[in-house]
A protein has these predicted regions:
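Negatively charged, low-complexity tracts enriched in Asp/Glu with abundant Ser/Thr
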Residues: 1-46
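Prokaryotic Sec-type signal peptides and long signal-anchor helices
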Residues: 15-18, 24, 58, 82, ...
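A general marker of short, structured functional hotspots
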Residues: 7-10, 16, 60, 72-74, ...
Length: 108
């Protein structure tokens, strides 16, 4: 059985290493601002779908979460602020790809 707590903590870590700060978490209805990693993970795990929002240099990205997918597919999509620089978006995408590669390897 997949430990989604570990999966989401890992995703947050990969984004933080890329310089993105966790700024909010949503359970699909309500949002908590400036959560700790534990608060964010607990909040999102309280539902089947949620999101984690990050910021870097004033630009935001949101990772959409579905609980129940394979670990590497838990983050199923991204949204971003429209004026985000290509370099910043690539840094987030690269972190997401590295995270997926890690979980794909662990699931193999």
């Amino acid at each position: 059985m997949t430990d989604y707590n570990k999966v989401l903590r890992s995703f947050i870590h990969f984004q933080e290493v890329a310089g993105f700060k966790l700024v909010s978490a949503s359970d699909g209805e309500d949002r908590i601002k400036a959560p700790s990693t534990t608060e964010a993970v607990d909040w999102v795990l309280g539902t089947e779908e949620g999101s984690l929002s990050f910021a870097k240099d004033g630009h935001g990205i949101t990772a959409y979460v579905i609980i129940g997918n394979e670990a590497s597919a838990t983050i199923y999509d991204f949204g971003n602020s429209k004026d985000i620089p290509a370099k910043t978006l690539k840094e987030s995408d690269d972190a997401w790809t590295a995270w997926m590669d890690k979980w794909d390897a662990l699931e193999a």
